[in-house]
């Protein structure tokens, strides 16, 4: 993954150096703006942010520009390719890019899953530019975030669909053309339907998390999954993400799990075990967006049913049922909590409105990112201080566990309250601790687990000591 991303980066950088900022011929696609148009874009920036639509070559150029400006805290990599061969590019921002630092949580933003929903794509490009600019200015909030969080930003999960939508004239950009990938697959209905599995497990007993454990090969062999879907599944499996948001368009609301209803009906509040923290996470986004959180905002369209919306948030199933969505897949296949944010009534609004969308969402994007530092965090180790990977962290009263990463580090998002946490692992004695969780920051709770073999040896030594004492006392 990283090697291929490195080769792409070297090629892009060579082209940038040779041509000032132009891309290679490989990046010039049919329908892409001419060089003169790209130069116009370079001139139309405000505080380092270009409030214009970025076609695929320009998206690559924008990410490379951020990397060239902030090489010490960023890197570009790809998680795979779209059906038509475009790279699914990610820019990472961290004080140690490319490395998972033990104890540091991992965050991701994904945009443009539906190719014709363009605002999220642009906001994530703007966000990368903003984080780089503000870090260099010494903005304390941004510096602290980048030093304490590994941030991954994927502006476009569906670059093929976006190119198709962007090539349409006028209003045809908006509602239909380019929504699906180049195969005609709706990516947000294409993930393994883990909701149906967990709903059965709720009734009959069974796992409540990591429902795709050790099934990567099956994912690769599933011909019904789009290449974009497979790439993201591997990404989710490979990196210990804690928090995520998937940016869409077509309405104004922050949507939280579950997306698919339990009964199969079209509309039904479908709470997940972490309903309390998910409501709080959704509000952390919506409350900083003045339009999204406005209780008097009229529906985007006359016949829209926004009755499930509360403070700019909604439970997914209460709004409308979505089987096979990426949001619930994150929650049920990994440790990652994800919400879906609808950013705009129009899916592909006029270019001149992009600046106002950025102004409405900038604080929300930062606020949501900060939520990763809530709940409980820590390490699970053995008595010798060695990390225990894949240890289970259970919360009494919440039927959804998380697991420790390879360094024994774990993160458990929780709403404020008093909890009992239990750490367990095969071959070890479980330990339970009580913890009072504030709104923020995350409380550190470490666990040291004793192995069964160590306990047996300890019991043997205690027995020998007892026998020695009895022998000395009774003189035999």
Curated annotation (Swiss-Prot):
Keyword Cell division in record: no
Q: Report the residue ranges that make up the Peptidase M14 domain in this protein.
A: 52-372
Q: Which gene encodes it?
A: Cpe
- Do you know which InterPro entries this protein is assigned to? CarboxyPept-like_regulatory, M14_CPE_CPD, Peptidase_M14, Peptidase_M14_domain
The protein's UniProt keywords, in alphabetical order, are: Carboxypeptidase, Cleavage on pair of basic residues, Cytoplasmic vesicle, Disease variant, Glycoprotein, Hydrolase, Membrane, Metal-binding, Metalloprotease, Protease, Secreted, Signal, Zinc, Zymogen
Q: Which GO terms describe its biological process?
A: cardiac left ventricle morphogenesis; insulin processing; peptide hormone secretion; protein localization to membrane; protein localization to secretory granule; Wnt signaling pathway
The terms under GO molecular function for this entry are: carboxypeptidase activity; cell adhesion molecule binding; metallocarboxypeptidase activity; neurexin family protein binding; peptidase activity; zinc ion binding
Q: Can you say where in the cell this protein is located?
A: Cytoplasmic vesicle, Secretory vesicle; Cytoplasmic vesicle, Secretory vesicle membrane; Secreted
**What biological function has been recorded for the protein in this entry?**
Sorting receptor that directs prohormones to the regulated secretory pathway. Also acts as a prohormone processing enzyme in neuro/endocrine cells, removing dibasic residues from the C-terminal end of peptide hormone precursors after initial endoprotease cleavage.
Q: What's the protein name?
A: Carboxypeptidase E
Looking up Gene3D superfamilies in the UniProt record yields: Carboxypeptidase-like, regulatory domain, Zn peptidases
Species for this entry: Mus musculus (Mouse)
Note the Pfam families from the entry: CarboxypepD_reg, Peptidase_M14
Glyco sites are at 139, 390
């Amino acid at each position: 993954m990283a090697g291929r991303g490195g080769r792409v980066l070297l090629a892009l950088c060579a082209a940038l150096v040779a041509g000032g900022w132009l891309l290679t011929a490989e990046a010039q696609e049919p329908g892409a703006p001419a060089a003169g148009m790209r130069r116009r874009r370079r001139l139309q920036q405000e505080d380092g942010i270009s409030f214009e639509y970025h076609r695929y070559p320009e998206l690559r150029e924008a990410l490379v520009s951020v990397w060239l400006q902030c090489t010490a805290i960023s890197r570009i990599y790809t998680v795979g390719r779209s059906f038509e061969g475009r790279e699914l590019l990610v820019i990472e921002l961290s004080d140690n890019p490319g490395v998972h630092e033990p104890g540091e949580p991992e965050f991701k933003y994904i945009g443009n899953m539906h190719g014709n929903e363009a605002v999220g794509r642009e906001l994530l490009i703007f966000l990368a530019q903003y984080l780089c600019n503000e870090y260099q200015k010494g903005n304390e909030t941004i510096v602290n975030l980048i030093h304490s969080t590994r941030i991954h930003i994927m502006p476009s999960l569906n670059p093929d669909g976006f190119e198709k939508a962007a090539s349409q004239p006028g209003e045809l950009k908006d509602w239909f053309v380019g929504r699906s990938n180049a195969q005609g697959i709706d990516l947000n209905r294409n993930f393994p339907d883990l909701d149906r599995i967990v709903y059965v497990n709720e009734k009959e007993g069974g796992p409540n998390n990591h429902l795709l454990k050790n099934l990567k090969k099956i994912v690769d062999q599933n011909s019904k999954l789009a290449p974009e879907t497979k790439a993201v599944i591997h990404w989710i499996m490979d990196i210990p993400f804690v928090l995520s948001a998937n940016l869409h368009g077509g309405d104004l609301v922050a949507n939280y799990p579950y997306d698919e209803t339990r009964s199969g009906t079209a509309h039904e509040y479908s709470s997940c075990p972490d309903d309390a923290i998910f409501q709080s996470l959704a509000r952390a986004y919506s409350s900083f967006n003045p339009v999204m959180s406005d209780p008097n905002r009229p529906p985007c369209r006359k016949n829209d049913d926004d009755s499930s919306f509360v403070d700019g948030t909604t439970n997914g199933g209460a709004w409308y049922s979505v089987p096979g969505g990426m949001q619930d897949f994150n929650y049920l296949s990994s440790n990652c909590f994800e919400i879906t944010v609808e950013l705009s009534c129009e899916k592909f609004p006029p270019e001149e409105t992009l600046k106002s969308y950025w102004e409405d969402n900038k604080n929300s994007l930062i606020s949501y990112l900060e939520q990763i530092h809530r709940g409980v965090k820590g390490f699970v180790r053995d008595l010798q201080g060695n990390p225990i990977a894949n240890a289970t962290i259970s919360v009494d009263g919440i039927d959804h566990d998380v697991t420790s990463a390879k360094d024994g580090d774990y993160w458990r998002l929780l709403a404020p309250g008093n909890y009992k946490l239990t750490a367990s692992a095969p071959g070890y004695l479980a330990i339970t601790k009580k913890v009072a969780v504030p709104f923020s920051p995350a409380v550190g709770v470490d666990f040291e687990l004793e192995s069964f073999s160590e306990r047996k040896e300890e019991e043997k030594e205690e027995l020998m000591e007892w026998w020695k004492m009895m022998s000395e006392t009774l003189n035999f």
